[in-house]
């Protein structure tokens, strides 16, 4: 309520001083008769509408501050018009000039001189107009005021600063009246601050006593309850601790008893073992004495017999090793012949050497042993036989890698006959049309058969010579002729050349194995 009252007072002060803030301004009014034309009539109506709008805005601004603020901010020249209206309204001379009586006399042509009022003539100048200055309200720093009271005082001081910044000049009586009311307002605020602090202090003391009393009662109740709870808690903990300690020490006792039992059993077992060892040593001593006595008699030649038996065993081992190695060499020779017969066969199916090479590896480990794992000498190298066997396993040792037979190589070469005819008719750098034309005319060519001249380089002669070499199982010469081919013909024979080289490599490795086997 106090804050509302102070805010209302500040609003009244602000409104009152705003109305007295302008100076008196005089002027003459010149009446001009408009010409009776349509343009002047429209101009007159427009001026009348603008005048009515501004007059209505000024009238509304005197009764509603929000609309007045909106009018002065949004309409051009509205702020000056409102200030002039306030000045003329509260000035006695101007008010009399704008009175109804003055206007009637003006229209009748009578003397309309405005005489200043007697009161205005009797009042001195320094009493009639005085600059208003209000002192700010300050509370004593030693008194701790409430935050709400401090906010009210700050709001009032901001309003007073706004009034002082306007430097309002008003009559002396009104100034003194305003100052007296302001002093009374300050006294009321200070008295209200004092009463508010006393009321707050008294309320705080009463609330504090009530809270302390309640806290003490709650503390006594909680203390009694906590005492009972603590007694029960410690009693239960003591019983639980007692049971745990009994269990713990009972377990320790059982463990110690078990350990002592095991210790006694181990000690007893050790004593029995020691006794048995002693008895065995005594028995061994007796046996040794008996053997020594017998050795010096009937068993005097037993050591010589033992050495001869060891020599015989070593001789038998060596003979067995030689026989085993010779048998393994024979088996290796047979296995090499089996592989060679498969390679030279005219079977239509591919040749798989996985099982044969596995058996050959087993026989090689027996007949041609490699370096011992314990030997770390750097100069030791595997034999040529084992190197060739390793290379042969890398080429054809897997179960999926198969070697083409002689018949398959020959048949696949014959499949390239039509492509060779086409290639023999191709011009250099032939395009699609050249390939098509060569393919067409190759249908009219005959294939050359039989032996061809060794020096002939035309494709027909080369094809016939390779065909003849394959027919006589001369794969190495056929491969040599294919290698000499160039260009498109070499591309056509690429897959066939890979398979033929692979078969030829296997044959050469088999020949190496056969040669090395003869030197073993």
UniProtKB/Swiss-Prot annotation:
It is found in: Mitochondrion inner membrane. Pfam families: Mitofilin (PF09731). It is a single-pass membrane protein. InterPro entries: MIC60 (IPR019133). Residues 21-42 are mitochondrial matrix. One of its GO terms (biological process) is protein import into mitochondrial intermembrane space. The chain crosses the membrane at residues 43-60. One of its GO terms (cellular component) is mitochondrial crista. Residues 1-20 form a transit peptide. Residues 61-520 are mitochondrial intermembrane. Residues 176-325 form a coiled coil. The keyword Kinase does not apply. The keyword Coiled coil applies. Keywords: Coiled coil, Membrane, Mitochondrion, Mitochondrion inner membrane, Transit peptide, Transmembrane, Transmembrane helix. Belongs to the MICOS complex subunit Mic60 family. Component of the MICOS complex, a large protein complex of the mitochondrial inner membrane that plays crucial roles in the maintenance of crista junctions, inner membrane architecture, and formation of contact sites to the outer membrane. Plays a role in keeping cristae membranes connected to the inner boundary membrane. Also promotes protein import via the mitochondrial intermembrane space assembly (MIA) pathway. Component of the mitochondrial contact site and cristae organizing system (MICOS) complex. This is MICOS complex subunit MIC60. The gene is MIC60.
């Amino acid at each position: 309520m106090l804050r509302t009252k102070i805010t209302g007072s500040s609003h009244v002060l602000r409104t009152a001083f705003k109305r007295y803030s302008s100076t008196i301004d005089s002027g003459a009014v010149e009446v001009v008769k408009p010409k009776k034309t349509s343009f002047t009539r429209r101009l007159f109506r427009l001026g009348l509408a603008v005048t009515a709008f501004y007059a209505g805005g000024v009238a509304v601004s005197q009764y509603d501050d929000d609309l007045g603020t909106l009018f002065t901010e949004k309409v051009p020249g509205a702020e000056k018009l409102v200030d002039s209206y306030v000045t003329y309204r509260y000035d006695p001379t101007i008010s009399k000039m704008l009175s109804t009586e003055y206007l009637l006399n003006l229209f009748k042509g009578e003397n309309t001189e405005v005489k200043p009022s007697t009161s205005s003539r009797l009042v001195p100048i320094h009493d009639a107009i005085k600059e208003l200055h209000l002192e700010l309200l300050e509370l004593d720093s030693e008194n701790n005021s409430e935050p709400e009271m401090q906010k009210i005082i700050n709001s009032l001081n901001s309003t007073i600063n706004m009034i002082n910044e306007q430097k309002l000049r008003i009559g002396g009586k009104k100034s003194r009246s305003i100052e007296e009311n302001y002093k009374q307002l300050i006294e009321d605020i200070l008295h209200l601050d004092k009463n508010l602090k006393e009321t707050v202090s008294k309320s705080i003391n009463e609330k504090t006593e009530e809270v302390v009393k309640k806290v003490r009662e709650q503390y006594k109740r909680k203390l009694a309850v906590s005492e009972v709870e603590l007694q029960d808690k410690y009693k239960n903990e003591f019983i639980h601790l007692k049971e745990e300690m009994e269990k713990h020490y009972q377990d320790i006792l059982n463990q110690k008893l078990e350990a002592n039992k095991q210790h006694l059993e181990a000690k007893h077992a050790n004593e029995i073992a020691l006794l048995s060892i002693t008895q065995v040593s005594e028995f061994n001593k007796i046996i040794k004495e008996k053997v020594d006595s017998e050795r010096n008699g009937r068993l005097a030649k037993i050591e010589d017999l033992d050495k001869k038996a060891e020599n015989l065993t070593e001789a038998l081992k060596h003979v067995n090793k030689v026989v085993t190695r010779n048998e393994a060499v024979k088996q290796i020779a047979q296995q090499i012949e089996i592989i060679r017969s498969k390679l030279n066969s005219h079977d239509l199916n591919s040749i798989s050497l996985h099982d044969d090479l596995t058996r050959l590896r087993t026989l090689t480990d027996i007949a041609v042993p490699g370096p011992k794992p314990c030997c770390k000498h750097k100069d030791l190298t595997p034999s040529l036989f084992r190197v060739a066997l390793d290379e042969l396993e890398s080429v054809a040792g897997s179960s999926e890698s198969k070697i083409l037979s002689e018949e398959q190589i020959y048949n696949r070469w014959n499949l390239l006959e039509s492509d060779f005819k086409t290639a023999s008719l191709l011009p250099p750098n032939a395009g699609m049309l050249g390939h098509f034309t060569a393919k067409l005319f190759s249908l009219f060519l005959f294939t050359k058969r039989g032996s061809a001249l060794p020096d002939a380089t035309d494709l027909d002669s080369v094809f016939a010579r390779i065909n003849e070499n394959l027919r006589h199982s001369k794969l190495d010469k056929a491969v040599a002729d294919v290698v000499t081919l160039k260009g498109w013909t070499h591309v056509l024979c690429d897959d066939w050349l890979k398979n033929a080289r692979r078969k030829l490599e296997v044959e050469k490795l088999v020949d190496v194995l056969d040669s090395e086997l003869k030197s073993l």
